[in-house]
Amino acid sequence: MKTNLFCYSATGNSLIVAKDIAAMLPETQIFSIPKIIDQDIDLNADNIGFIFPVYFSGMPRIVIDFINKLELSIDKYIFAVCTCGSLPMGTLLQVQKQLSTKGITLNAGFSIPMPGSYIIKY
């Protein structure tokens, strides 16, 4: 089964997670959201994953814009993985709501705690 991972990573934490997932799944490609957001997107995969950091208890704007641009079909397995310094808060619920506006279901959502990168906090 082919898997496409769409990743947004500012500090590298989410990219590491994407690479780890890709290493465990056969036929997996990682796409950088900033590099492909203005291109035609290859959705010819059985599984679609979104991997991104939590920004201020939610999704980064670029990920929201990217999901809004996609024309997903309901026969795909859709999952999201968010990386966070502490808690994901309502981020995965936000992903679910964003996809539901397109008639798509989020099949699974995961959060992975990572080292914090919010400099003001430290």
Model-predicted regions and their roles:
Residues 1-5, 10-122:
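FMN-binding flavodoxin-like domain, especially the glycine-rich phosphate-binding loop
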